[in-house]
UniProtKB/Swiss-Prot annotation:
One of its GO terms (cellular component) is ribosome. This is one of the proteins that bind and probably mediate the attachment of the 5S RNA into the large ribosomal subunit, where it forms part of the central protuberance. In the 70S ribosome it contacts protein S13 of the 30S subunit (bridge B1b), connecting the 2 subunits; this bridge is implicated in subunit movement. Contacts the P site tRNA; the 5S rRNA and some of its associated proteins might help stabilize positioning of ribosome-bound tRNAs. NCBIfam families: PRK00010.1 (NF000585). This is Large ribosomal subunit protein uL5. Pfam families: Ribosomal_L5, Ribosomal_L5_C. PROSITE patterns: RIBOSOMAL_L5. The keyword tRNA-binding applies. One of its GO terms (biological process) is translation. Belongs to the universal ribosomal protein uL5 family. Part of the 50S ribosomal subunit; part of the 5S rRNA/L5/L18/L25 subcomplex. Contacts the 5S rRNA and the P site tRNA. Forms a bridge to the 30S subunit in the 70S ribosome. Keywords: Ribonucleoprotein, Ribosomal protein, RNA-binding, rRNA-binding, tRNA-binding. GO terms for molecular function: rRNA binding; structural constituent of ribosome; tRNA binding.
């Protein structure tokens, strides 16, 4: 059973009861997942940017967008409009497919993994996790990687509080660390 159907059939009714909500539309749901990678070396090394774009597309199943510098920063040798990273925004079926792969396949492959931190919520029910290396994803092969790079993964939910967001993600199978 896919994560999307599991959400509709089991998670949503359970959250409706557990959170004491009156309407099905009040139940928190995942709106989008954003993968972001900042590349400091992209200003000087264009091959790093190309490799990163290819990796992000492989991981997400969607073409990555090049993020560019808004301002020139002389100390970092960056001019306005220079490529400095890449990001992917996932919605709909691709989002649920990525979340399922991330929770069930990628997270357990992290070295010394004891669960994700329950403190990474932003106060509005959105969760951000930093991944130190891209090799945890099964789509990435070790031979094709030139350097190990991390990324930020933000899960944006419609939850109004951190408690609702945590309840939603833990029902989806996110392994939170016990305090």
């Amino acid at each position: 059973m896919s994560l999307k159907t599991r959400y509709r059939e089991t998670i949503r009714p359970k959250l409706l009861k557990d959170l004491g909500l009156k309407n099905v539309h009040q139940v928190p749901k995942v709106q989008k997942v954003t993968l972001n990678r900042g590349l400091g070396e992209a200003a000087t090394n264009s091959k790093a940017l190309e490799a990163s774009l290819k990796e992000m597309a492989t991981i997400s199943g969607q073409k990555a967008l090049v993020t560019r510098a808004k301002k020139a920063i002389a100390t970092f040798k960056i001019r306005q409009g220079m490529p400095i990273g890449c990001s992917v925004t996932l919605r709909g079926d691709r989002m649920y497919a990525f979340l399922e792969r991330f929770i069930n396949l990628a997270l357990p492959r992290i070295r010394d993994f004891r669960g994700v931190s329950p403190k990474s919520f932003d106060g509005r029910g959105n969760y951000t996790i930093g991944v130190k290396e891209q090799l945890i994803f099964p789509e990435i092969t070790f031979d094709k990687v030139d350097t190990i790079r991390g990324m930020d993964i933000t899960i944006v939910t419609s939850a109004s509080s951190d408690e609702q967001g945590k309840a939603l993600l833990s029902e989806m199978g996110m392994p939170f660390r016990k305090k």
